[in-house]
Amino acid sequence: VDRLLAYHAGIFRALIAAGELQAEDPDTLAMQYVAPVLTLIGICDRQPEREAECLDMLRRHVALFFRMVHKKEPLQ
């Protein structure tokens, strides 16, 4: 889990530096992004019949996460 979090924190650091994401703590962003993914993987491991449901939840999670952290341009 530590390597997974460090990997995603690095991605978020780069996206923040490029001005794509809001300047928030990349380590916290990584935890917020990864934790639901690991939860969904755990559900699929224990209940494979829920895979389609979990994939839909994953899609919605990723979309919501990036809507929340994407750097919005100021209105002019």
Name every feature range the model reports, one short phrase each.
Residues 9-18, 26, 32-76:
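C-terminal peripheral helix-coil segments that are non-catalytic and often amphipathic
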Residues 6:
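Alpha-helical elements of the RecA-like P-loop NTPase motor core of helicases
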